[in-house]
A protein has these predicted regions:
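Phosphate-binding active sites in nucleotide-utilizing proteins
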Residues: 1-77
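Catalytic beta-strand/loop signature of glycosyltransferases that borders the donor
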Residues: 1-3, 86, 165-167
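Active-site donor-binding loop signature of nucleotide-sugar glycosyltransferases
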Residues: 2, 87, 141, 187, ...
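Conserved nucleotide-binding/hydrolysis micro-motifs of P-loop NTPases
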Residues: 5-6, 87-92, 143-146
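PAPS-dependent sulfotransferases, especially Golgi type II membrane carbohydrate sulfotransferases
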Residues: 25-57, 96-138, 146-230
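Structured core elements
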Residues: 59-61, 81-86, 137-141
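Short N-terminal helix/helix-N-cap motif within the alpha/beta-hydrolase-1
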Residues: 68-71, 94, 149
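Conserved phosphate-donor/acceptor-positioning beta-strand/loop module used by diverse small-molecule
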Residues: 73-96
Length: 230
């Protein structure tokens, strides 16, 4: 069941911190959480998100900042499933750069800060892969575009859910969508946004410089032209 970009995970953490009389400031207060606090966190999160959902087995929290709290989510909600939606680093960053967000995400309006944020995201996710093995699934946008059927089945298998044909017709949903993808989810899958960054490569030099360690690891055809020519 779809919801929105929920902020209840952080607010629930603060609530449990205060009710447990933990004086340490958030987020360092999480270091003082014991088994009881983690249990309370899971209960508080599920309780405060009830208003966004019905009685479906699973619901989706699309908040992109949740990646920083994957360890906490695992301790608080052990049966949660984390989907790490990825795409080419330059497409991912450029997509954020050209988007005017309703609030927050100030780093996304500066290519240097955006690149640094993305590198930190990669570092944090590498850590979670080591300590939370099997808890989340990487899904590449480009793979979804090229083979939606296989990727949908892969995601549903990870979530232990049966396949439904309606999953391939997501664009038919009547549900209100309030995130930056509100227009895209009303359309079938399209490929025009794959490698969109190449149209602006000359203007993305600052971003490319920061992301170079990641970009060098990609297949040659996915690297900036300036890399391939050297």
């Amino acid at each position: 069941e779809g919801t929105h970009e929920l902020h209840e995970m952080v607010s629930s953490m603060r609530s449990v911190k205060e009710s447990s009389n933990i004086d340490t400031r958030f987020p360092h207060a999480l270091e003082s959480f014991k088994a009881r606090q983690w249990q309370l966190l899971g209960q508080e999160y599920l309780k405060t998100t009830e208003k966004y959902r019905t009685n479906k087995l699973f619901f989706i929290d699309k908040n992109p900042n949740n990646f920083t709290f994957i360890g906490a989510i695992k301790l608080a909600i052990p049966n949660a499933k984390i989907i790490n939606a990825k795409r080419h680093p330059l497409d991912s960053c450029f997509g954020s750069y050209k988007q005017l967000f309703a609030s927050g995400q100030p780093f996304s309006y500066d290519l240097t800060e955006l690149g640094e944020y993305y590198m930190e995201y990669e570092r944090i996710m590498s850590h979670w892969k080591e300590v939370c093995e099997g808890f989340f699934l990487d899904v590449n946008y480009e793979d979804v575009v090229s083979d939606l059927d296989s990727q949908v089945k892969r995601i549903l298998e990870f979530c232990e859910l049966p396949f439904e044909e309606s999953c391939l017709r997501f664009y038919e949903t009547k549900r209100a969508v309030k995130t930056a993808s509100s227009e895209q989810v009303r359309k079938p899958i399209y490929s025009s946004s794959v490698n969109l960054w190449r149209n602006y490569e000359e203007k993305l030099s600052d971003l490319i410089e920061i992301l170079e360690p990641l970009l060098r690891e990609l297949p040659e055809q996915d690297q900036p032209k300036s890399f391939v020519s050297h």
